[in-house]
Structures are given as structure tokens and as C-alpha cells.
């Protein structure tokens, strides 16, 4: 990358914590190199306490865009000038575009599109399917929206934090009004309802942080009877590549287990196009993810 850097190099950033595990710098910098673009992508360790200063830095330095990850996806909303319709509906942002570097910041959400493209890549269709989704943070809400827009029959949401239930219920109400998908919300503490939902589902999606450090030894599913030969299990965590949930599901005969690498690739590709205005060469980038 040092050979490409010049006085004209444009910067794209990632604002998150922790960031050491992130694949985004590798993906985006390789894409810039493949396309011959004079851009550089850097990750910055930024939590909610530093977020306002970091966003002002995007404006002041003319940074062309930024990806946003935990814990900043919702906290960044009041710091932006505009939101895309999807980001406004979800109430979270993972991509910020600074058009022409002029300081007008627009927030977008690409997690849902990325997740559904990753599932399609594995031959998994959500149309007319019953899906249980655990975790309704920024990524989980984005996935729920995309599942409804793509024609899922039912989306059964379960949340770990009771404090989120009321705010997420507003999204549930909107999705039930805007789409034909039946969307429900329950507390993950209700294990009876959770297990019943999985038993009736074609696809289980874990959009929580369970499975990644420091929770790498935990799994939301521990009952072998919940794993069926016709159940697909998708964990959006990608580090480790096989979470305890995915290992458990594979060992007990799930139809398919899918980690978060594909979602990272495709949400990144969507973000790349929003910021750069060109398609990411995903076929060239995809093999790099297997190196991690």
C-alpha cells in the first residue's frame, strides 16, 4: 500500500471498538489496489465517548466515508446530517458517506443486504420461510428488515436486552404494516418460546455477540434436539470462523452452517459502492477472507 500513497490519497475509515479482528482494512485496501484507486482504508479504535470528535474529524479532514461498527451504530445517528430510508427505518448506521468530502454526512445501513447476499451465496432462500433471529442490535434489525422485504413468511425476533424491547417493537409494527411478513418480538429469557420458535423454523440466525471474545465458549443453542437435518444455522460472527454454536449445529446434523464471513464481504461491497461509486471486485476479495 505504501507505493500507492501520495499527497492525493483519499482516506476511508472504520470507527469501532474492538477493531483488531476486523477484516475491513484488508478487504478495502486490496480492492483499491485491484482497481488502481488512490484510496487508503484505516481502522480507528473509537468508542461512544470519542465518537463525536471522530465524526467531526471526518468533516475536518475530508475523509470520504467511514464504516461504523459496535458500539457506534446507533450512537452515531444524531451526529449525521441525513439518513438513508433503510437506516432511518432500522435506526442504525454502518456506513457514512461524505459526498465529495464537503462535510455533509449521510448514514446508510448495508448489514441486511450483506446477510441476505451471503445466504443466497450458500443457496439459502428466505422467501416464504419461517426464520428465528436472535439479537436486535443494529445488525439484527437490518437483517430483520431485509428478511421482511425479501418475502420471508415469518420472522421471530428474540432480544437479549429487555431495555430494547419497546424501541424494537416500533420496528416490528412498521414491518407488519409495510410487508406481508409476520414479524414478532419476544424476550430471549423466555427459553420455552425460543425453543418452540427454533423447532418451527427453517433458518436460525444469531445476530448477537455470543460466540466472539470474550463469549467464545457460549452458544445460544445447547439442546441437541433443536438441531434438525432441515435447519440452517447462520451466525454473523466471523472470528472465530466456527463459533461454538456452529460447531454444535454441525456436530448434531444441521442442514447447513454459515459463518459471518460472507456477510462481511457483501456488506462491505455495498459500503464500498456507496463511498467510492464503483463495484468492489468481490471475486478477487473473497479468497482473502479464507486466510484469516
Swiss-Prot record:
Keywords: Amino-acid biosynthesis, Aromatic amino acid biosynthesis, NADP, Oxidoreductase. One of its GO terms (biological process) is amino acid biosynthetic process. It is an enzyme of class 1 (oxidoreductase). GO terms for molecular function: NADP binding; shikimate 3-dehydrogenase (NADP+) activity. InterPro entries: Aminoacid_DH-like_N_sf, NAD(P)-bd_dom_sf, SDH_C, Shikimate_DH, Shikimate_DH-bd_N, Shikimate_DH_fam. Signal peptide: none annotated. NADP(+) binds at residues 135-139, 236, 260. The active site is at residue 73. Pfam families: SDH_C, Shikimate_dh_N. Shikimate binds at residues 22-24, 69, 94, 111, 238. It catalyses: shikimate + NADP(+) = 3-dehydroshikimate + NADPH + H(+). Its EC number is 1.1.1.25. PANTHER family: BIFUNCTIONAL 3-DEHYDROQUINATE DEHYDRATASE_SHIKIMATE DEHYDROGENASE, CHLOROPLASTIC, SHIKIMATE DEHYDROGENASE. Involved in the biosynthesis of the chorismate, which leads to the biosynthesis of aromatic amino acids. Catalyzes the reversible NADPH linked reduction of 3-dehydroshikimate (DHSA) to yield shikimate (SA). Homodimer. Belongs to the shikimate dehydrogenase family. This is Shikimate dehydrogenase (NADP(+)). It comes from Streptococcus pyogenes serotype M2 (strain MGAS10270). The lineage of its organism: Bacteria, Bacillati, Bacillota, Bacilli, Lactobacillales.
Amino acid at each position: 500500500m505504501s507505493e500507492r500513497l501520495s499527497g492525493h490519497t483519499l482516506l476511508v475509515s472504520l470507527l469501532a471498538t474492538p477493531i483488531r479482528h476486523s477484516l475491513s482494512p484488508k478487504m478495502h485496501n486490496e480492492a483499491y489496489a485491484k482497481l488502481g484507486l488512490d484510496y487508503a482504508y484505516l481502522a480507528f479504535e473509537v468508542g461512544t465517548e470519542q465518537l463525536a470528535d471522530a465524526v467531526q474529524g471526518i468533516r475536518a479532514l475530508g475523509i470520504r466515508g467511514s464504516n461504523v461498527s459496535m458500539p457506534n451504530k446507533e450512537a452515531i445517528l444524531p451526529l449525521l446530517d441525513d439518513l438513508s430510508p433503510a437506516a432511518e427505518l432500522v435506526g442504525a448506521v454502518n456506513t457514512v458517506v461524505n459526498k465529495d468530502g464537503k462535510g455533509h454526512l449521510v448514514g446508510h445501513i448495508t448489514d441486511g443486504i450483506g446477510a441476505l447476499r451471503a445466504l443466497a451465496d450458500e443457496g439459502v432462500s428466505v422467501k416464504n420461510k419461517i426464520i428465528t433471529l436472535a439479537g436486535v442490535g443494529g445488525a439484527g434489525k437490518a437483517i430483520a428488515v431485509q428478511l421482511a422485504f425479501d418475502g420471508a413468511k415469518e420472522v421471530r425476533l428474540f432480544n437479549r436486552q429487555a431495555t430494547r424491547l419497546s424501541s424494537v417493537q416500533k420496528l416490528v409494527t412498521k414491518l407488519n404494516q409495510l410487508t406481508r411478513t409476520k414479524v414478532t418480538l419476544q424476550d430471549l429469557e423466555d427459553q420455552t418460546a425460543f425453543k418452540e420458535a427454533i423447532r418451527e423454523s427453517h433458518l436460525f440466525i444469531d445476530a448477537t455477540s455470543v460466540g466472539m471474545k470474550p463469549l467464545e465458549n457460549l452458544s445460544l443453542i445447547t439442546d441437541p434436539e433443536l438441531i434438525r437435518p432441515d435447519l440452517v444455522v447462520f451466525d454473523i460472527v466471523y472470528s472465530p470462523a466456527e463459533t461454538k454454536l456452529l460447531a454444535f449445529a454441525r456436530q448434531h446434523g444441521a442442514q447447513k452452517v454459515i459463518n459471518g464471513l460472507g456477510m462481511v464481504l457483501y456488506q462491505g461491497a455495498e459500503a464500498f459502492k456507496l463511498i467510492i461509486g464503483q463495484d468492489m471486485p468481490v471475486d478477487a476479495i473473497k479468497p482473502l477472507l479464507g486466510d484469516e
